Amino acid sequence: MNNIQSLDKLTQIISRLPGIGTRTAMRLALYLFDCDDEYLKEFSDVLSSLHENIKLCQVCYSLSDNDICDICSNDKREHNKICIVESYPDMLAIEKTEEYNGVYHILGGLISPLKGIGISDIRIKELIERVNNNSIEEIMIAFSASLEADTTASYIYKTLKDNNFNGRITRITYGISLASDIENADSRSLARSILDRVDMN
């Protein structure tokens, strides 16, 4: 068997990416081999500077070029409304609907005992501090439909109430298929879910 060490190593690294199997990783590795040196250098430079150039917004924890992201620094956004999402791709999906003009808070995960993700592993403490230090009128929870999402939403609701938050706490409706998630939902369905959001009791 003709094993090429460098190619095998590259294939192994690529196959660690989500959704990439060994065969696809091999095809991508061969594609990169066929690329010219200029492209490979540019590709390498971007990868090596990824953590240096991309930051977490100090307010909402979105990915950003700067310490404060474009949304949080935009005076035209409704800063009295916070949409809580699990991840950056979920935030992008909601932005794409053009039906929400508030700001965001990215948790970085959902409570999941089976996966070993507890309350302290996601940014609930930071959310409460943010709400307590600002004049917030509405918290909109926008999670995909799952048991972990329900658990996390319920905990956030209880914690906000325990901290005397008197504004609205809403949650998007499930126009989204249970087999889907926010990141992959079509914009029309997601927009309707936002417009039809309901108050949590």
Swiss-Prot record:
Q: Name one Pfam family in it.
A: Toprim_4
- Please provide the record's keywords in A-Z order: DNA damage, DNA recombination, DNA repair, Metal-binding, Zinc, Zinc-finger
Q: In the UniProt record, does the keyword Zinc-finger occur?
A: yes
Q: Where is the Toprim domain?
A: 80-177
Q: Which CDD domains match?
A: TOPRIM_recR
Similarity comment: family membership = Belongs to the RecR family.
* The protein, known as: Recombination protein RecR
Q: Which organism is it from?
A: Brachyspira hyodysenteriae (strain ATCC 49526 / WA1)
